[in-house]
Amino acid sequence: IDVVSLANNHAFDLGEEGLINTCKQLDKLGIKYCGAGLNSEETSCPAVVTFAGVSIAFLAFCDWRMDTVGYVPFATKNKAGMNEMREKNIKESIEKNKSQYDHLFIFLHWGVEYSYFPTPSMTTLADKILNWGADGIIGGHTHRIQPLISSHNKFIYFSLGNFFFPDRYINKPRPTYYPSEGEDLSNCPYSYGWPYVSILY
């Protein structure tokens, strides 16, 4: 793992102290992160990695709507929190960073939980983000894998689903990752399987 997004509705579950500790642990492991911090300046900083001389920057934003992600503390000049997924904020961040790196990707924590499809507002915003100059979009939050589409010769992953997640529901979403060997998961319940879609007649 080289880069993670901290812009999500659980990064502040243990308050500012918890966020600070998360950042410290990631620093120790050498994992770059973006989307959250002790103030708005930190949250808007990209996580940058270089492969074969190519610089790749990541910016991360968390949705602000109560009906999708619930309460999320957003960072201000003097307050810790998340990077807010407002159009103006995203556009300005892309314009500020686009010319400094070879590629710029956007993490978005958005969407309706347990839905297999993006909302119209998601597709509209995604199109704008690519027009503003981002090279691709990687989404999460829905606990379901949502469509991958190509637009402007760039890719939009609306939601990657669950990589590794302790779900409390009986009909658990399938994980994105299927371990065949390696990690000992004997003490951590998880489920394989296909997505379950309830159909009412």
List each model region and its residues.
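Structural recognition of the beta-strand scaffold that forms the well-ordered cores
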Residues: D2-A7, D13, K32-G35, I56-A60, ...
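Conserved beta-sheet core of the metallophosphoesterase superfamily
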Residues: D2-V3, P120-L200
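Short acidic, glycine-rich surface-loop motifs adjacent to enzyme active sites
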Residues: A7-N9, I94-F117
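Active-site environment of divalent metal-dependent phosphoester hydrolases
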Residues: A11-C23, S40-C45, W64-V69, G111-Y116, ...
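Generic structural signal for well-ordered alpha-helices
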Residues: C23, P46, I90-E95, A126, ...
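Binuclear metal-dependent hydrolase catalytic cores centered on His/Asp/Glu-rich metal-binding motifs
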Residues: T50-L104, T124
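Acidic/histidine-rich helix-loop elements
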Residues: D63-K88, V112-S115, P166-Y192
